């Protein structure tokens, strides 16, 4: 469970992801948005998952956080369709999510959670104060044989 914040712009953040994470983060974003709705009394299409993960805590803390992640989720849906020529199943819950947005507490955008770490792979950028840089470094270290080079390099 994570939000790879490679840019403060939710659309660019989605565009910058490699193919593997584009697919994975679309599902995880949907799960985070659903968990926030469930925690605040709604009935989301996906069950609550990883309740106390820092990304989950961040998502449900304020409506501005939830809105940022929703825009990122929409961008991931578009990016997935552009890259693969098909619609991801998690794209189909957009209206259900949006109809329960009002349940999320009002508030400003708070600092992104920095979870840029995978100790089994020897990658840890959680000490980095600039969260977007932390995720860029994390992904650069883990970039596999994707055809595209990271756009920030």
Label every model-predicted segment.
Residues 8, 20, 57, 77, ...:
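Generic alpha-helical secondary structure signal
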Residues 101-153:
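Aromatic-residue-lined binding/catalytic grooves and analogous aromatic/hydrophobic interfacial grooves
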Residues 19-22, 26, 62-65, 69, ...:
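Intrinsic-disorder-associated interaction segments
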Residues 16, 46, 73, 80, ...:
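Sequence-level detector for tyrosine residue identity
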Residues 38-83, 89-93:
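Amphipathic alpha-helical packing elements
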Residues 1-44, 54, 61, 74, ...:
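Phosphate/adenylate-binding glycine loop and adjacent helical scaffold
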Residues 91-105:
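Domain-level detector for trafficking modules
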Residues 3-4, 11-12, 94-98, 139:
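Generic preference for hydrophobic/aromatic residues in regular secondary structure cores
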């Amino acid at each position: 469970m994570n939000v790879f914040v490679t840019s403060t712009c939710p659309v660019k953040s989605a565009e910058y992801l490699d193919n593997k994470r584009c697919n994975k983060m679309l599902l995880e974003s949907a799960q985070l948005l659903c968990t926030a709705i469930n925690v605040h009394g709604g009935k989301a299409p996906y069950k609550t998952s990883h309740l106390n993960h820092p990304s989950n805590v961040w998502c449900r803390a304020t409506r501005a956080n939830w809105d940022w992640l929703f825009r990122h989720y929409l961008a991931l849906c578009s990016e997935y369709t552009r890259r693969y020529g098909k619609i991801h199943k998690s794209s189909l819950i957009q209206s259900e999510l949006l109809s329960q947005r009002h349940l999320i507490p009002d508030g400003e955008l708070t600092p992104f959670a920095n979870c840029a770490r995978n100790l089994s792979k020897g990658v840890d950028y959680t000490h980095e104060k600039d969260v977007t840089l932390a995720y860029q470094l994390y992904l650069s270290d883990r970039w596999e044989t994707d055809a595209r080079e990271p756009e920030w390099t």
